[in-house]
A protein has these predicted regions:
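Non-catalytic linker/capping segments at the edges of enzyme domains
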Residues: 1-76
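HotDog/MaoC-like acyl-thioester-processing domains
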Residues: 2-22, 131-180
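Short amphipathic beta-strand and strand-loop transition segments with alternating hydrophobic
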Residues: 38-48, 124-129, 141-146
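A structural detector for beta-sheet-dominated domains
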Residues: 58-62, 129, 176-178
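A short mixed-secondary-structure module that forms the rim of ligand-binding clefts
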Residues: 71-89
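Hydrophobic beta-strand-centered segment that forms part of the acyl-chain substrate-binding groove
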Residues: 91-138
């Protein structure tokens, strides 16, 4: 999994906090007890290349929404947390017209209407380097590549999670975003 990002030292990096109300609206399709993304921030460089658009999030899973407490972060929770940080990243990029491949087809109303049926996971690979504390952890989401076709936009992404200790999980996900 190649996800190392080289930043041109001439580019300035801007970090902005994503409003919690915006996060809440994007995560509205989730039941309250399964909204694991608590806070998010967005960073971008002057280049505005899709690879420079990165979201960081703070997560907490007080109790699993589907199983007794396993005591650790697992593949199902990876997928749910990935979806949540991905949706917030995508919504922020559409709102601010940062990714033309998406902004050409979607505005915010269309995104909210189509986020569940039109954002598909085509491929997901995740790995767990060490046990991650699901009660409080952090995630980073970014884009490796984008390819737009007439019916679909394919987005190759990465998403990594870590806790305050040694807990680590990494993954790469290919999305297929259908044209509305």
């Amino acid at each position: 999994m190649n996800t190392l990002r080289m930043v041109d030292p001439r580019d300035s990096i801007r970090v902005s906090t994503i409003d919690d109300g915006f996060v809440g609206k994007v995560l509205q399709p989730y039941y309250e007890h399964s909204r694991y993304l608590k806070h998010a921030s967005f960073q971008q460089t002057d280049s505005l290349e899709p690879q420079s658009l990165i979201m960081n999030g703070e997560f907490a899973i007080p109790e699993s929404c589907y199983i007794d407490d396993t005591g650790h972060f697992n593949a199902v929770e990876y997928n749910i947390c990935f979806n949540q940080i991905c949706y917030v990243h995508m919504a922020h990029c559409i709102k601010n017209a940062l990714i033309p491949e998406l902004s050409d087809d979607y505005d915010m109303d269309t995104f909210y209407e189509k986020q569940l049926p039109n954002v598909l996971i085509a491929k997901l690979a995740s790995s767990y380097q060490s046990q991650l504390n699901a009660k409080h952890f952090y995630g980073t989401y970014g884009i490796n590549a984008i390819k737009k076709t007439s019916k679909c936009t394919f987005i190759k992404t990465y998403c990594h999670f870590h806790d305050d200790g040694d807990g680590r999980s990494t993954g790469e996900v290919t999305l297929a975003v259908l044209a509305p």
